[in-house]
Amino acid sequence: MAVATVDHRLRAQAADEAAMVAARCRELVVPHVTLVADEPVAGASVQARAREVRYRLLARWADSAGVEAVATAHHADDQAETFLMRAARGSGLAGLAGVRARAVIGGAVVVRPLLDWRRAELRAIARRREMPFVDDPSNQDLRYDRARARRLLDEHEWLGPANIARSAAYLAEADADLRATVDWLWAARATVDGDDVRVDAAGLPREVRRRLARRAVAAAREAAGIAEPAFTDATNVEALLDGLEAGKRVTQSGVLASVREGRWRLRPAPLRRG
C-alpha cells in the first residue's frame, strides 16, 4: 500500500496539510508522496478543473508506482451531494447514478470503499483512533454548488443522505445493466468502416438510441481525427435524435448523420467553404 496527497495549489495551507499526511504515513511506515499540480487550476468551474487535475496526477502516479487501484475516501454524504447537484442540473440516469464504487479514470482503476459510510461515522472513528484530519474550508464556501448542497443536507436531515446514496447505487446498477445492453446492441447492429459508421436503430427505445448515437458520433470522430468541438459521453444529442426521428440530415460535433428506414449513417461533415 502507498499513499498520495494532491496539492492543487489553491490554498496556502495545502502544503502543511500534505506534510501532516506524510508525517502520519511515516509513523505507519507507509510510503507517501505529495503530487503538486503542474498547471494552474482555474476556469469557470474551479472544483471541476481541480478534479480533472487530481485524477490525472493520481493516474500518472499509479502507473509509475505500479499501484493496482487508487482508493478514495468518498462517503455517503458525498454521494448525496453529487445526486442533488446533478438533479438540479437535469442530469439523466448516468449522472444521477453519482459516484461509482469502481471506475476507470484516466487509465487508473479507482475504487471507493466508503460509499456506505456517513461523514459523521468516519469522523468518529478518526477521533477514537486519534487520527489527525483537516476540514477543507472550501467545503463551506457557498460559491460552490457542492457547499450549497451540503448546507441543504445539513439543515434538512429528513432528506436522508444515506437513502439518497442508496438510490444513487440502484441507479448505478441500472446504468451498468443498460450499458451492457448497449454494448451488445452495438456489436449486433453497428458497422464501422473507417469513418463511415452505420447503426440499425429501428425499434429501439430512445435512451438506447441516445447511447448508441453518442457511441456512433464518437466512433466517426475518432476515425476521422476530429478533436473540435469537444464531445463526451455526456454531450447532449437530443437535437440529433429529434432530427433523425424526423428523417432529416443532422450535424453533431463535426459528424453528419442521416437516416433511412431506421438505419443511421454517420460520417465526417463536409468542411464549410469560406
Kindly give the residue locations of the regions a language model identified.
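Core alpha/beta nucleotide-donor-binding catalytic domains of modification enzymes
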Residues: 1-152
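Short, surface-exposed loop/turn segments at secondary-structure junctions
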Residues: 136-140, 161, 225-228
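Short alpha-helical scaffolding segments that buttress acidic/His motifs in well-ordered protein cores
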Residues: 83-84, 164-168
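AMP-forming adenylation/ATP pyrophosphatase catalytic core
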Residues: 2, 6-8, 37-39, 53, ...
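Residue-level detector of well-ordered alpha-helical segments, enriched
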Residues: 79, 163, 208-212
